[in-house]
UniProtKB/Swiss-Prot annotation:
Family that this chain belongs to: Belongs to the UbiA prenyltransferase family. Protoheme IX farnesyltransferase subfamily.
Function: Converts heme B (protoheme IX) to heme O by substitution of the vinyl group on carbon 2 of heme B porphyrin ring with a hydroxyethyl farnesyl side group.
InterPro entries: Protohaem_IX_farnesylTrfase (IPR006369), UbiA_prenyltransferase (IPR000537), UbiA_prenylTrfase_CS (IPR030470), UbiA_sf (IPR044878)
Protein name from the UniProt record: Protoheme IX farnesyltransferase
Other remarks on this protein: Carbon 2 of the heme B porphyrin ring is defined according to the Fischer nomenclature.
Enzyme kind, highest EC tier: transferase
Membrane topology: Multi-pass membrane protein
Compartments, as annotated in UniProt: Cell inner membrane
A GO cellular-component term linked to this record: plasma membrane
One GO molecular-function entry: protoheme IX farnesyltransferase activity
Length: 290
């Protein structure tokens, strides 16, 4: 039973988001003092709020999940976990997570994580995901909140650097999510979810992916120009963005779109991991600041 409750929180999604929290935290740490305890409380608070959102997503998406082969065996769908208990589980995690951020970090980070929660649960899960091709765009807002919370936990104020960080992760979410929608298109079709590749076609989705990767690259380089990043960041981001764009530029048609989209997806993970890692490396004494 414990394992089933853990599965409701979608640990993979939590881990991916915690990497982005680290990115925001490390970026802010270049200009503000930090402590290990603040990092731990921030990570734990964000993890609990994300876990709560994922549980609520499982509850409200149970009708959709039942139609897709990838999700039809989830605990809520099979009935192995009671919906009322799952909802209580989500509420407890939400309260503890936001409470930790409010008390141990600052109220601004708690407010921001709640804003992300509202976008994910109400605007994305309950509304746009089911009704609009722009659901991915709405979801990208909630996906870009964790790094911003990591940043605000340290600084307690918004800045141009914070805005660029938020924009960068919003832009990253789009091609990443469109790639997933392409290689899982049959599942989305069975569940009648209006993702871009289904509504507009795979070539239109490819065009959008290429544009978003290009704009992502510009914003990532803008963070070097206007933020507290060094030459290590510039080198890693330039290489990562070039590699990602090169993958998206490969020929793609009906015969290879699954393979192509999986390559775009995998490269997106490498790019964002490299981005987050280099921000941490630059905190080391031998890093070169600009």
């Amino acid at each position: 039973m414990f394992k089933e409750y853990v599965s409701l929180t979608k640990p993979g999604i939590i881990m991916g988001n915690l990497i982005s929290v680290l990115a925001g935290y490390f970026l802010a740490a270049k200009s503000e003092s930090i402590t290990l305890s603040l990092l731990v409380y921030t990570m734990l608070g964000v993890a609990l709020v994300i876990a709560s959102g994922c549980v609520v997503n499982n509850i409200f998406d149970r009708d959709i999940d039942a139609k897709m082969s990838r999700t039809r065996n989830r605990a809520i769908v099979t009935g192995s976990i009671n919906i009322e208990f799952a909802f209580l589980f989500a509420i407890i995690m939400l309260l503890i997570g936001t409470g930790l951020l409010y008390k141990m970090a600052n109220p601004l980070s708690a407010v921001m994580v709640l804003l992300g929660y509202v976008f994910y649960v109400f605007f994305y899960t309950m509304w746009y995901k089911r009704t609009s091709v722009y659901g991915t765009l709405v979801g990208s807002v909630s996906g870009a909140i964790p790094p911003l919370v990591g940043y605000l936990a340290v600084t307690n104020y918004l800045s141009l650097e914070a805005v660029l960080l938020f924009g960068l992760f919003c832009l990253w979410q789009m091609p990443h999510s469109y790639a997933i929608a392409m290689f899982r298109m049959k599942d989305y079709q069975q569940a009648n979810i209006p993702v871009l590749p289904l509504v507009k076609g795979i070539q239109k989705a490819r065009q959008h992916i290429m544009i978003y990767v290009l704009v992502f690259s510009v914003v990532a380089l803008g963070l070097y120009a206007f933020g507290h990043t060094g030459y290590e960041y510039l080198a890693v981001v330039a290489i990562s963005c070039y590699g990602w764009f090169k993958v998206t530029y490969r020929n793609m048609d009906e015969s290879n779109y699954v393979q192509w989209s999986k390559s775009v997806f995998k490269t997106s993970l490498l790019a964002i991991t490299a981005f987050s890692t280099v921000l941490g490396i630059e905190l080391l004494p031998f890093s070169i600041t600009f």
